Amino acid sequence: MNRVARFALCLSLLFSAAVAQKHPGSGKASSVNAYKLIAVKVTGTERYTDKEVLAASGLQIGQDAADGDFKEAVQRLGNSGLFSNAVYSYSSSSAGTKLELQLADTDKSKLVPAYFENFVWFTDDELRTALQSRVPLFKQLLPIAGNLPDRVSEALQAVLTERQFPGRVDYLRHAEESSDTLTAIDYRVEEVSIRIRSVEFPGASPEQTALLTTAARQLTGAEYGRASLAAVARLDLLPVYLQRGYLKAAFGPADGRVVPQSSAAADAQGPAELQVDAIIPVTPGKMYSTSGVHWKGNSAIATAEVTPLIHMPAGQPADAVRLLRDLDSVDKLYRSRGYMTVRIKPDAQFDDGKSTVHYDLNVVEGDLYKMGELEIAGLDTQARARMQGAWTLREGQPYNADYPKRFLDDTGQLLPRGVRWDISVHESLDAKDKTVDVEIRFKQQ
């Protein structure tokens, strides 16, 4: 069964089947062997071998086969979605029939990776081997159109059933939220509870393991899933290294090791409830110390003013997490001066021989924006007039992105008493006039 996540897929499969047939000659000898398939030649594809295509076609060398069988084989290959065109021809003689399949591979842009979310009983290599024996054309990439994703799902279900493992295989099509472009197909086992008992970090030192275990404490008892573990590794675990100068640390795909159940536990929990030890491998890499920080591109604000905001002392482990926080402070400073589109990009220059890193902080200041129109909504006439009178940032003055918050903090006494307010501030940038219109909206709770 296929569930679609944020992506509507219109399956449209176009391929042609052209036939060039040379009929067998007359005579008894030819009638005996003419339909025996003795050879298959595959041309046009750069992704698949003759053996893989033959296995996927459903044909077998040595079987009796005729034109109808070849049409079905081409249809089967075309329906997979892996070929944009499929053409066949054959010739027959007294020795048998020779078939040629001319294929055109589907463009790589129409293929997406397949991921296996929670098949904790298998390694990736074991799954790939099991799949390729059942779906010969499977090579980690799947077409966005065609039936191959379904064939893979059916094969995975067959593997589970054969090994007497619980669960039902399903898959999700993942797409980018901004464009609905399909990015991956994610297979997972449903109708089984797989909970994390503990988390291991092969590759980490004992000191690092202690820090990682603390950072990953929310995983204990959580549902096992590779996507969620990858998110935790990126958001919670990687900063453990980045804070300490391990700027090239990387986490690999997670695996799960099934915790053996006693007979009593298995009877109590049932086969559809499992515990696993999650395994998240890490490669820490070198620890880098800061050798220097250099500002580039800043002119509206002097280097002497922004330098104290950066806490990257030379000779100390480079704290990339702190650097991002510091750059956010610099960004806020620029916005308080009216530079609303400022961009600051750190460029790390590594010296692996010395285990040091030098940062160039590249500033694109953008244009100076000025105060535009002020709109206050949701208040009665008198309260609105009081608030507008208290607003001192006038049209045409350099905009200060800090001002709206400070204004609201200082003018609470001007609002009607006895009312709790939800207050939202919306800034609208006019790129042509280089102005900022401010809307402050009040809503009674």
What is the predicted role of each segment?
Residues 1-8:
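Bacterial N-terminal signal peptides that target proteins for export
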Residues 3, 19-20:
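Intrinsically disordered, low-complexity regions enriched in serine, threonine, proline
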Residues 8-16:
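Bacterial N-terminal signal peptides
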Residues 21-445:
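Periplasmic polypeptide-binding modules associated with outer-membrane biogenesis and secretion
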